[in-house]
Amino acid sequence: MSFKNNLKLLLSTQNVLIYILNSEEERLEYKIHLMIRQNIKKTIYCWNFIDGYYNNPNYLNKAIRNPLQAIEFIEQLNFPTSTIFFLKDFHVFINDISVIRKIKNLSRFLKQANSSIIISASEMQVPSLLKDFITVLEFPLPNYEEINLELHRLFKIMNVDSSIYSEYFHDLTLAYRGFSIEKIRISIAKLLTSNLSSTHLIKNILYEKRQLIEQTDVLEFYAVDYSFDNVGGLNVLKDWLNKRSKAFSKQAKNYGLTVPKGILLIGIQGTGKSLIAKAISGQWNLPLLKLDMGKIFASLVGQSEERMRHMIKTAEQSSPCILWIDEIDKCFTRLNNYTDSGTNGRVLSTMLTWLSEKKKPVFVIATANQVLSLPSELLRKGRFDEIFFLNLPSLEEREKIFQIHLMKFRPLSWRKYDIKYLSKLTDQFSGAEIEQAIIEAMYNAFYEKREFSTQDIINAINNFVPLAFTDTCNISAIQDWAISGKIRMAS
């Protein structure tokens, strides 16, 4: 149910105390006034700590700097019928016992008068003594239609011809997802006066979004310049992803397609799991948010779950986007769920519920190295659209990986290197280890003040001990599990 319909229902069913979490007080007040005029036909009294009651000329300056008087004022009005009392920042005062007692005393009379108190709050501060009286709502940030409408309004006010940006207006609107209306106004006013091109305009908005997201402390915004051309091999996985590249478009929605949930990538270290996350972001042209699971967990009881919920909210507000959860196996293991105080289990439960039920266009990419220690709930169907295994690259894939890295380091002369021979030498090497061997060869040649050659790479390979040789048991166990048919192969 939408926020508007939810609030309308609460106000029409004698809910005495409604607590609205929001970061846009001005917009919330406007929406409530609009709802009253169009649908509810109630009287509204607005209060803030500095001005007291300010919107009714008969009661100006009542209860200035006195939150208890703000509640007592309701009684002085003799409980008028069908009235809303909109109290700003009242969460700061609601834990006062005098305020709590007065609200409880008034609740029965407010219900009889079909009147309500709406508290506008920037954070959750609900006293336990009022939990049975309060209904909590969350005021969402502006949706696509609201942002689009506001941008057209701002363009008109600033005498900017919106047709100049018409081709990119959809992308412009999407870029501002996760912004408040006030932040959009400040941002677009600054950017439009700079006379930027459409492409640079969107890049600047994404930079501002990056700063906004990183204020959460648990999410990191990745600006990537990758595509599937940077990924060697993994053709099955890339084909699967290509078929979903337009999954968040209007055409897909009109076709009746559901929003994809995401993928779990399991594999040996260095096989390209993190690279794929970055490549999807670039290929699909969607922002990439990386979750720092270590910062989710806190020492205070309940704080970890709250941080996870806040992360989910931020990701959904920034949608469509890609959420990258790297090395999820380090945080959620079967052992942790049994040995810790229950925090891991509760955080995992919060995340799994969201993965199963989410409707917003957030594509989740989770990566793991140790599949055998992952809790079975994470592998259950419905959490992710698909689970892929990334094995050590084949001969053909190693050739492609060598080509990609040599083209990156020597874009004009990469063909002079004997890629086929190098690929045969690097059996059991991961993609990351191949790159490291090339870098090692470059360092050695640079030290000798000359260009590096195929022989330098061969020497580096001969001195390199890949993980497959040092961790044979674990890698063999993972490969045996994958080959058994319990997971889809990425190649």
Curated annotation (Swiss-Prot):
It is found in: Plastid, Chloroplast. Transmembrane segments: none annotated. Keywords: ATP-binding, Chloroplast, Nucleotide-binding, Plastid. One of its GO terms (molecular function) is ATP hydrolysis activity. ATP binds at G267, I268, Q269, G270, T271, G272, K273, S274. Belongs to the AAA ATPase family. Highly divergent. This is Uncharacterized AAA domain-containing protein ycf46. It comes from Gracilaria tenuistipitata var. liui.
